[in-house]
Amino acid sequence: MGFFEGIMLRTRYIEWASQLEKVLQPASLQGKTECVRCGFCCARRPCIPTPDELKVIAEFLGMELKEAVKKYFVGDVLGGKSIEYVFPAKHSQEDVVGEFLPARRTYDEGYCILYDEEGRGCTIQSVKPRSARDAKCWEDTDTLTPALETWRGIDIEEYGIER
């Protein structure tokens, strides 16, 4: 993916997210300090489970780890830190589950594959990763960095991600 293509995709994604935020009206726009289950967090970018949380999620789903990864997750890399990690794909990325997410797909629109749009909730709520449990749209907090750091030095191919 070229530089300008990346800028265009990012710009289009930001516009989409801005429109979605207006429609969904998350707690931050309502002046509330509790989750209103609008799904905006689950649409912007899925949460990042730690390697241990990923194993718990697979068990909750009644699957072997690699089986769950190949059905629901993708791999990515945090640019400046060279940390590879695994996280839930979006519904629009179902064609690349179990694979390393192509750069041009970073800004795909849509909800997390584990989010139930009709029921407006997480299908793995009881084992939802800490990065999602701690996320509060009404606060400016970084819940992803701690989860990302747990992936440092881990080969995500061991979790079933194909390159």
Protein language model features and the residues they cover:
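Short loop/turn segments that flank or connect secondary-structure elements
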Residues: 1-163
